[in-house]
């Protein structure tokens, strides 16, 4: 994750993949295997609450200070900032749950840390069915944060916390609410 730092990098990866059909190309989107995400996917696949209306996701890191001088703070090595580090997992889950998005409106900022990578990203996405998704990926959250809300025609899911080695994102939870 991600498949490359630039479009040219990604094209090279695709070329190699085509030349080597005997190999499997995989990316590190490990969030798909967390218990709350697997249960949410099951609810969606079983159509328990009808169509998805929208998503709202926040994925933030508490500080980037340890990254001063680190490769993650340098675009030439990292390809980008907080979106490619953490936010890409949220985008993957949006797509894992409802497919590709066709429209994107976004803003990026490096207002606080002033690195050559972004420290905050806000984006709104829409797919061909009109499902919308909103993401805020932040390196100025001041506390690790993970929250994904999914609103359906007949219910609501909230995934919060994320099992990690540091346990800094809190206890992983899935709240399931049926429309009253």
Q: What is each stretch, according to the model?
A:
Residues 1-32, 47:
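Beta-strand-loop-alpha-helix segment that lines the small-molecule cofactor/substrate pocket
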Residues 7, 14, 41, 92-95, ...:
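A cross-family signal for key residues in well-ordered alpha-helices
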Residues 15-19, 42-46, 71-74, 121-123, ...:
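Short, hinge-like loop/turn segments at secondary-structure boundaries
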Residues 23, 31-114:
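Predominantly a Rossmann-like dinucleotide-binding segment in NAD(P)-dependent oxidoreductases
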Residues 55, 71, 104, 123, ...:
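Well-ordered beta-strand positions enriched in small/hydrophobic/aromatic, beta-favoring residues
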Residues 85, 92-166:
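Contiguous beta-strand/loop segments that form the cofactor/metal-binding neighborhood of enzyme cores
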Residues 160-180:
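C-terminal active-site/capping subdomain that shapes the small-molecule cofactor and substrate pocket
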């Amino acid at each position: 994750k991600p498949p490359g730092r630039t479009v040219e990098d990604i094209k090279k990866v695709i070329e190699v993949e085509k030349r080597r059909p005997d190999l499997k190309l995989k990316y590190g989107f490990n969030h798909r295997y967390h218990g709350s995400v697997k249960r949410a996917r099951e609810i969606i696949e079983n159509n328990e609450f009808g169509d998805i209306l929208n998503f709202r996701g926040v994925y933030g890191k508490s500080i980037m200070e340890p990254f001063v001088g680190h490769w993650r703070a340098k675009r030439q090595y990292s390809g980008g900032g907080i979106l490619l580090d953490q936010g890409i997992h949220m985008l993957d889950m949006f797509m894992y749950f409802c497919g590709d998005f066709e429209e994107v409106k976004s803003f990026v900022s490096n207002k606080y840390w002033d690195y050559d990578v972004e420290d905050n990203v806000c984006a709104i996405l829409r797919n061909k069915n009109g499902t919308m998704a909103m993401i805020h990926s932040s390196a100025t959250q001041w506390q690790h944060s993970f929250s994904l809300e999914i609103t359906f025609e007949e219910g609501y899911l909230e995934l919060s916390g994320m099992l990690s080695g540091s346990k800094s994102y809190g206890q992983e939870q899935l709240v399931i609410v049926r429309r009253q």
